[in-house]
């Protein structure tokens, strides 16, 4: 499979198309001028580690385990993404409450499936385990909400890769019988019901081979 250039979408790692930083800034300009709200997501198909600083991870272990390291531009810490995990991002010219609406929707969705879900300190937990992390980063007049939902979380790999101690222990939703396809459908349903992206449809940046 041809490796494609990385497109950092408010901390959302994409391998969808070749773009430059200038092209990305052009997209941000369109939002400022048009007041657009954009949402994107992807399903991870190759292991990747998103880092704010490379010093946060053991690069040799990443290479040994087959994880690519990609530097992000948000203020989140290191996140180890396994195949099947969901990454998503939303950005807008002004803070529009998307962050809180998504949290409420996803927690309710998990509870409807009988799971002990709660939101605390930028994370969604199930039985005390972290299954979703979010952060909001402000660049000038643009608000970025970036997040991930763990599906096939590999705790042994995370412990080996990350140099910083974990504040919360992660767990994949596959341990509760939930699949990537179900989470993808949930995310699209939320975006459709939320109605915050009338100017631009939700974009799926999956790989092409």
Regions found by a protein language model. Name each.
Residues 6-64, 70-73, 167-209:
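Active-site loop/lid in soluble adenylation, ligation, and acyl-transfer enzymes
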Residues 37, 101-118, 130-209:
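Long, positively charged amphipathic alpha-helical accessory segments at protein N-termini or as interdomain linkers
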Residues 49, 55-56, 119-129:
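Ser/Thr-rich, low-complexity intrinsically disordered terminal regions
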Residues 53, 90-94, 151:
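Short beta-strand-to-loop capping motifs
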Residues 57-93:
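A glycine-rich, hydrophobic loop/mini-helix early in the fold
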Residues 82-125:
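Contiguous, small/hydrophobic- and glycine-enriched helical/loop subdomains that border
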């Amino acid at each position: 499979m041809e490796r494609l250039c990385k497109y950092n979408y408010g901390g959302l790692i994409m391998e969808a198309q070749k773009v430059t930083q200038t092209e990305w800034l052009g997209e941000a300009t369109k939002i400022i001028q048009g007041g657009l709200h954009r949402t994107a997501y992807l399903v991870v198909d190759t292991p990747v580690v998103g880092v704010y600083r490379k010093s946060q991870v053991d690069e040799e272990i990443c290479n040994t385990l087959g994880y690519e390291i990609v530097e992000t531009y948000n203020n989140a810490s290191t996140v180890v993404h396994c195949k099947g995990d969901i990454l998503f991002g939303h950005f807008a010219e002004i803070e529009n409450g998307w962050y809180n609406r998504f949290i409420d929707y996803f927690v309710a969705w998990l509870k409807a499936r009988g799971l002990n879900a709660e939101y605390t300190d930028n994370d969604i937990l199930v039985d005390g385990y972290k299954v979703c992390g979010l952060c909001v980063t402000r660049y000038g007049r643009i608000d970025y909400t970036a997040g991930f939902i763990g599906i096939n979380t590999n705790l042994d790999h995370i412990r080996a890769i990350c140099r910083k101690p974990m504040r919360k222990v992660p767990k994949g939703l596959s341990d509760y019988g939930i699949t990537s396809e179900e989470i993808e459908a949930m995310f699209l349903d939320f975006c459709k019901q939320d109605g915050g992206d009338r100017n631009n449809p939700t974009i799926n940046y999956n790989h092409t081979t």
